[in-house]
A protein has these predicted regions:
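Active-site beta-strand/loop architecture of penicillin-binding DD-peptidases
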Residues: 78, 86-90, 98
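Outer-membrane beta-barrel architecture
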Residues: 13, 95-97, 185-189
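Secondary-structure capping and boundary motifs in well-ordered enzyme cores
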Residues: 74, 88, 177-178
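Outer-membrane beta-barrel domain signature
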Residues: 81-85, 172-175
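Repeated loop/turn-to-beta-strand initiation elements of outer-membrane beta-barrel proteins
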Residues: 102-106
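Extracytoplasmic gating/loop element in the C-terminal half of outer-membrane beta-barrel translocons
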Residues: 4-8, 58-61, 114-192
Length: 192
């Protein structure tokens, strides 16, 4: 996006999973939206979460709720935002060594702080569009308010407007910070 650093991830921010009550309220919002010429009247307060399209019938509970960045009550390209950046804030490394009675121990460490990564493995293994396997956790997706699953995995759907699997979103962006021992050596010097 123009005006932002190179390496930024740009997409939708996931803020939750749509419950049955959210769904019913979004349907009420859709009636108002359609009755007013595909827009909301000035000053209208949403009953439910903003959704991708009030004109389509593909809305369902269990879908991802997206952040309405533009505040217009409809999720569209104006609601994409910067989700993170691939470049870390800083990186570094250090090494150390110890010796004692013929034994020596050396270790090297590297670290990176800040920066994000897109987990494309999750992108494919939560996706119902592909021909690959899925995570076992995906079987415990949201089904209903009485069976919400045990995780934050949205309902499985092949509908492109609501399918969170097809959108680059905060759902797949993870912190890339790390602290790692990159090398460790233990030695012993034989006496002469």
């Amino acid at each position: 996006k123009e005006g932002y650093p190179i390496g930024s991830f740009y997409g939708y921010k996931a803020v939750g999973i749509m419950s049955e009550l959210d769904y019913k309220n979004a349907l009420k919002d859709r009636e108002v939206y359609l009755a007013n010429g595909s827009k909301f009247p000035a000053g209208y307060t949403l009953q439910g979460p903003a959704v991708p399209s009030y004109a389509l019938d593909d809305l369902s509970y269990g879908n991802t709720i997206w952040k309405d960045v533009s505040g217009d009550g409809v999720i569209d390209t104006n609601d994409k935002t910067i989700l993170g950046n691939a470049y870390p804030d800083f990186t570094g490394g250090f090494s150390t060594s110890l010796s004692w009675k013929g034994f020596d121990l050396g270790a090297s460490f590297t670290y990176s702080y800040g920066g994000e990564v897109i987990n494309f493995q999750d992108y494919y293994l939560f996706n119902v569009e592909g021909s690959s396997n899925q995570y076992a956790i995906a079987a415990d997706r949201y089904v209903s308010d009485t069976n919400p699953g045990r995780n934050n995995v949205p309902i499985a759907t092949r509908i492109s407007v609501t399918n969170q699997s097809l959108k680059l979103s905060s759902y797949y962006v993870e912190d890339a910070s790390y602290f790692r021992c990159s090398n460790i050596t233990l030695g012993y010097t034989l006496p002469k």
